[in-house]
Structure formats: C-alpha cells, structure tokens
A protein has these predicted regions:
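Acidic, low-complexity intrinsically disordered segments
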Residues: 1-224, 231
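Short acidic/polar active-site loop segments enriched in Thr and Asp
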Residues: 62, 110, 234-237, 291, ...
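Catalytic cores of alpha/beta
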Residues: 102-106, 281, 341-356
Length: 470
C-alpha cells in the first residue's frame, strides 16, 4: 500500500526530522508498505501547498497522514483543501490530535488517530487492506458521511519499546537538503531511550507518551547508536527522553552496555529533572559519554514550583548544578515565565535565582513565556475565564516561530531577548508583571551572549534600573 506522511508547513523551521515522524514511517516500512514523506516544516523546504498536492496526485497514496501540533495546527488545516482535491483519505495524528480528535474531524480529516501512532497506523493500513471497519482500529475516531463519529477501542501505551521499528530505518525517506543545503548525505539524528514522565506539571499534557515510565533495553539503544553512527559518521547524539534519569538502575545497565559495545567515541546530551540525579549517577553517565545535561527548572520561586506541581525545589536545582559542574558537564536550564500566579515579586525571585545559579549554567533556554496547551491544567483552568478557548484556531496566534530559521547564534539570541509569546498575553499581565518578565528574558539573553563572547551589541547595553517593586 502506498502511504504518504506529511509534517505540515509551519513557521517553526526544523533542523532535523522529528523522531516521532521517523518512528511512524519506520513502522509502516517494516510491514512492507511503500512510504513517502514530506517535511514541509524543514528549515530549507521551499515548496508550497500546490507542490504538496501535486505530489499526492502523482503518488496516489491510499491515505495521507499528517502530524498535528497545537502551535501550528492552523497551517495544517489550511493545507487540507488542496489535499482533499487530490482525492485521498486524510488521517490526523500527533499530540494535538490526541487531545482534540473531534476538532480535527470537524476541520476535514476523515480519521483521527490518538495516542502513540506506531501500532495504530499499521492497524489502520491493515484495516484498509482487508476492508475492515476503520472504527475497529485502537485509538481511531472515524468521521461518517452523515457527520457522526465512530470511535474505536482505547489505544493503550506501547509497553515493549524494543519491538518498535528503529527510526533510523526511515531516514533515507527524508531529503537531507531539506535540513542542510550544503549537500550532506544524511539527516541529523537523535535517540529516545525511554518514553513517559512520572511528573504532574500543570503546564505539560504528556498525553501521547503518558506518565508511566517505559524504557528500552540497553542492547536496543546500543544497536541504534551504532547504526546511526555507521549511517552518518556522527559521534554526538542528543537523547530526547522527557526524564532520562527517572529510573536510575536501568542507567547503570545502559552505561555498561555503551562502554562495552558502542563502536565509536560516543558523546550525548540528556534532559532530566534536578531531583532525580545523584553525584554517582552523573559521574557514571559522564564515563559513558554524557557531555551536556539540561534541567527543567521553570521558576526560581518555591511557591510557584509548588503551585505548578513541579515536584522540584530551588535547593534541588542548586545541588544538581553543583554536582554536574563538579563532573565537568555542560549545563542548561529551562525557565518558564508568566504563570497565572506569577507576580512581580515571584518573578523578581526568579530573576535573583537565575543570577545566583548563572556561574553554574552554560546556557539558559531561549524560550520562556508560558503557553497554555490543550489537555493541561494550565489551559483547562483558565481558558474560559480569560477568553483564550481554542486559541490555536486564530490565525493571529499561528505565525510566531518558537525556533526561527537563524543560523547565526548571535541573531538567534537577540531574537529571544523579547519573547513574542509575551505579546499574545494569554494571562493578561499587568504592566509591572510584564516588565519583570522582560527583565528575566533580558537576563537570559545577556547570559547566553556573554557565554558566546557576543555581548557587544547596543540591544544589550545597560538600561535604567528597574523601578522598585511594591
């Protein structure tokens, strides 16, 4: 069966294909389907909707699957008329579809697949081949000709991650020129060693991979690393797990397997929480190739951390950073600014905390202002009262790029000295709160530019002191 997968156009220009997108393509390839992909969000993808529709007509797939993400779903919906004219079954997947399946059908999709897609998309293709009812597919929501919707059985989480087709087996489907015009022969790759996160943060939906933590065997991870290196020649790979260190015992097995069986000098980065690392663990991970660790901090005010159910304290953060630097690791910290409960005082405490830990931090995240995504308490608790219900369907919210296609790091950080998300004003900040958010953004930008030796710029020259807070 011919199947076309599309990552729709978006202002966010990607420097590498999404891992989830690769996983779905690999799952279909493994069972014998003829698969093509179009990554219209790639940094150097230049074709328009008419070109995409022409590819659909030429390929004549049995269905077209689109990956939907809340921030850019408006662009995906705008693409649908051209795809509909090409004449094919339209299938929605991805994080936004999992939270809002009915909405995707209302906007023109025939089928919405919720949850982890690797198994459900294969089941959908099988149902089409056999002539079975599409509503028999786990996680499927199927629009009928009369407008009604049939819903399949619930899609459970994939427990045996080793059984999934390795994403690198689909990398040949992605044109390297979409990501790098220099002519490199392979696309960049990353690795997932686990899925799920046990945290309960109010800003995170965690709807696809869930809160239960599942992990791959060490042998499976090592096999993928060796295959990626053989294909690309790269020795550095980012590990994209939401909570890499959530199960410490499995990491000792992984480190041993890496040291024993990886056939090159591996270097990797990881993302985790400050309360689930230890000095011994960081030392062990460094020995296996860890060079960079990113901690989700979110706020420097312990009361805000309690309200957002982060489960981490500022003391945890300081301690984890000290341990990481003692091992010579590069460090990064993510902060979120402007939660509904934030005040000028809580944000000033966050700024002071950033200043306190700055000597231990190589870089702060360039993103900052809180965005309420559907499926999160941050959205559900506030959208009706503050008037941003289904904000993602408004074109005005759909043109700010979280990651602009900027190759120059200096320009990149200048872009984020004033996060455009602040102008969306989801939580109706008063002037003092808005001013403090800008001060926090400014500090992060200055810190990052200073680390790169690029602070000489009039944008970052000292300004008048902040007005005293009441």
């Amino acid at each position: 069966m011919r199947i076309l997968l599309i990552n729709p156009p978006s202002p966010e220009r990607l420097g590498a294909p999404l891992l989830g997108f690769q996983h779905v393509a690999a799952a279909l390839l493994r069972v014998g389907h003829e698969v093509r992909v179009i990554d219209a969000a790639a940094r150097h993808f230049t074709h328009d909707a008419n070109w995409i529709a022409a590819q659909v007509r030429d390929f004549r797939p049995r269905f077209v699957g689109l990956a939907l993400f809340t921030r850019w779903v408006w662009h995906a919906y705008r693409l649908l008329p051209a795809l509909r004219e090409a004449g094919c079954l339209l299938v929605a997947g991805g994080a936004h579809t999992t939270v809002c399946p009915q909405e995707t059908l209302e906007h023109g999709f025939d089928v919405a697949l919720t949850g982890e897609a690797e198994l459900s998309v294969v089941a959908l293709a099988q149902a089409l081949e056999r002539g079975d009812a599409l509503a028999s597919v786990p996680g499927a929501h199927v629009r009928q000709s009369d407008g009604s919707v049939l819903q399949g059985p619930a899609a459970g989480f994939i427990e045996d991650l080793d059984a999934l087709a390795p994403p690198h087996t689909a990398q040949h489907l992605f044109d390297p020129l979409w990501y790098d015009p220099s002519g490199r022969e392979s696309v960049p790759g990353g690795v997932l060693t686990s899925r799920g996160c046990p945290a309960r943060c109010t800003f995170c939906a965690n709807v696809i991979t869930g809160r239960g933590f599942r992990f791959r065997s060490a042998a499976s991870v090592v096999h993928e690393l060796n295959a990626l290196h053989a294909r690309s020649g790269n020795s550095f790979f980012p590990f994209w797990d939401d909570a890499f260190t959530a199960k410490i015992p499995r990491l000792h097995d992984l480190c041993a397997a890496i040291e024993r069986d990886v056939q090159f000098d591996l270097r990797f980065s990881a993302i985790t929480r400050a309360n689930i690392v230890t000095p011994d663990l960081l030392r062990r991970l460094k020995g296996a190739g860890l060079v960079h660790i990113n901690f989700g901090v979110e706020s420097g005010d312990d009361e805000i951390l309690r309200i957002i159910k982060k489960g981490v304290s500022t003391q945890h953060v300081v301690r984890a950073l000290e341990w990481a630097k003692a091992e010579g690791l590069q460090t990064a910290c993510n902060f979120m600014l402007g939660f509904p409960e934030d005040t000028p005082a809580t944000l000033q405490r966050t700024l002071r905390f950033m200043q306190q830990i700055a000597p231990l931090v190589d870089s702060f995240s360039t993103l900052g202002v809180a965005v309420p995504f559907p499926g999160t308490p941050l959205y559900e608790d506030h959208h009706a009262a503050l008037g941003f219900t289904r904000w993602w369907l408004d074109e005005a919210y759909s043109h700010y790029a979280d990651f602009p296609a900027v190759e120059d790091r200096h320009r990149f950080h200048r872009h984020y000295i004033d996060d455009a998300n602040l102008d969306l004003d989801f939580f109706r900040y008063d002037p003092p709160t808005r001013a403090m958010i800008r001060e926090c953004l400014r500090f992060k930008g200055e810190h990052n530019l200073r680390a790169m030796g690029l602070l000489r710029d009039p944008v970052f020259e000292p300004q008048a002191p902040m007005a005293a807070l009441a």
